[in-house]
Amino acid sequence: MSKKITLACAVCSSRNYSTNKNVSNQSTRLEVKKFCKTCGKHTLHRETK
């Protein structure tokens, strides 16, 4: 069962990306380094509720 999640920048808290996550395989929050257009650089993006 996959769940739609939103990734938010850890620096400026803007929600830039949305993706799917398999809840049965991953119980922890997703953290990915991606480009933030607001900050203008690659930052850590965390899964939001």
Curated annotation (Swiss-Prot):
Q: Gene3D superfamilies recorded for this chain?
A: Ribosomal protein L33
Q: Supply the Pfam families for this chain.
A: Ribosomal_L33
Tell me the PROSITE patterns matching this sequence. RIBOSOMAL_L33
Q: Which residues form the signal peptide?
A: none
Which GO terms fall under molecular function for this chain's record?
structural constituent of ribosome
Q: What biological processes does GO assign it?
A: translation
Q: Report which superkingdom the organism of origin falls in.
A: Bacteria
Q: Does the keyword Ribosomal protein apply?
A: yes
- Entry GO terms, CC: cytoplasm; ribonucleoprotein complex; ribosome
Ordered alphabetically, the record's keywords are: Ribonucleoprotein, Ribosomal protein
Q: Which family does it belong to?
A: Belongs to the bacterial ribosomal protein bL33 family.
Q: What is the protein name given in its UniProt record?
A: Large ribosomal subunit protein bL33A
Source organism of this protein record: Oceanobacillus iheyensis (strain DSM 14371 / CIP 107618 / JCM 11309 / KCTC 3954 / HTE831)
